[in-house]
Each structure stands twice: as structure tokens, then as C-alpha cells.
Design a protein with these regions (language model features):
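Charged (often Lys/Glu-rich) extended helix/loop segments that serve as interaction or gating elements
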Residues: 1-171
């Protein structure tokens, strides 16, 4: 007790500070479109609203990196999701939604990764149910270390199939 005030019990929940590095999401760029004379969009093979809901709900920003083509020339693009919703995009900065990504050449694949997303994005988006605009749930892979310190991967869940979604809907 100090100055007549009992010492308080303080309880905390550190959330993303303790598990932030545990999550990553990888997307492929499935299309690129020129919206107008200034906006170019790279469209991912999923939805930010369903797989990274904090980017939409609270404008959370994550570590974002191009996975391949690092030696290519870069360009300013916007990243958009597959849904019909105008809010399905990655809000990179407060006043600029654009990010810099390698220029995509003809017949070239491009991948982008979001890292340090913690353990909450999957639980917020839901697992195994029906997502916004019927976007299927992604494949889930666990990366771990064995007793020798070597990395290994194991499949936790396959990408959600249209048949499983139709079954949930009663078809």
C-alpha cells in the first residue's frame, strides 16, 4: 500500500504483440486493370474482407512484400479483392491506397504476401463457413520446426470447395 492506495492487480492481454509473427497470407495477382489515367489495380485471387478483415474493418496495415520478381522495375498500384464490394481493397496509407509492386510482364505470375498478421484474421473471417460473396476459404498450411531445427510444412486444411459451400447452404 502506498499513500493509502492498495497496490492494484493489473491484467493484460498482449494479443498481436505476442503472436503477430505467427500469421502470413499469400495471394497471386490474377488480373491487372487500368481504372483511369492514374489508377492501376492488381487484383488478388481472394478477398481482403474475408482473409484480412482488419484491413477493411479498422484499416490495419500489415507487412506487405512482393514474393517474386524483385529484380523487375516497380510501379505504383492499388491492390483489390475479388468481391463486388467497393471496400474490398488494401488501404496502404491514410491518404494513398497505392503500394509499389513489380511490373507484371506478359504471361508472368506475381505473388504478394502479407506478414505479421497474428492469429486473429482467420478467426475474424471464420473458418469453414460461408464467406462474403461466396469467396472460398483459403488453403491453410502450418510451417513448423522439427527436433533438429529444420522447417517442415503440413496441410491443415484444403482450400474450401464449392461443393462444401453448397452443402452448408442446404444444396
Amino acid at each position: 500500500m502506498n499513500n493509502g492506495v492498495p497496490e492494484p492487480n493489473i491484467f493484460t492481454e498482449f494479443g498481436s504483440y505476442t503472436v503477430g509473427e505467427s500469421g502470413a497470407m499469400l495471394y497471386s495477382i490474377v488480373n491487372q486493370k487500368q481504372q483511369n489515367d492514374r489508377e492501376k489495380w492488381n487484383m488478388i485471387d481472394s478477398s481482403f474482407m474475408t482473409t484480412l478483415p482488419d484491413t477493411w474493418g479498422i484499416n490495419q496495415r500489415f507487412v506487405m512484400l512482393a514474393i517474386n520478381n524483385w529484380d523487375s522495375e516497380y510501379e505504383r498500384v492499388n491492390l483489390g479483392g475479388l468481391t463486388c464490394d467497393s471496400e474490398d481493397f488494401y488501404n496502404a496509407e491514410a491518404h494513398s491506397n497505392a503500394v509499389f509492386m513489380p511490373k507484371i510482364k506478359q504471361n508472368e505470375e506475381q505473388y504478394v504476401g502479407f506478414f505479421h498478421m497474428g492469429a486473429y484474421q482467420e478467426s475474424l473471417g471464420g473458418y469453414g463457413g460461408i464467406q462474403h460473396c461466396l469467396i472460398p476459404g483459403p488453403k491453410l498450411v502450418v510451417i513448423d520446426l522439427d527436433e533438429n531445427g529444420d522447417y517442415f510444412t503440413k496441410l491443415f486444411a484444403k482450400e474450401q470447395s464449392y461443393k462444401s459451400m453448397l452443402k452448408i447452404l442446404g444444396y
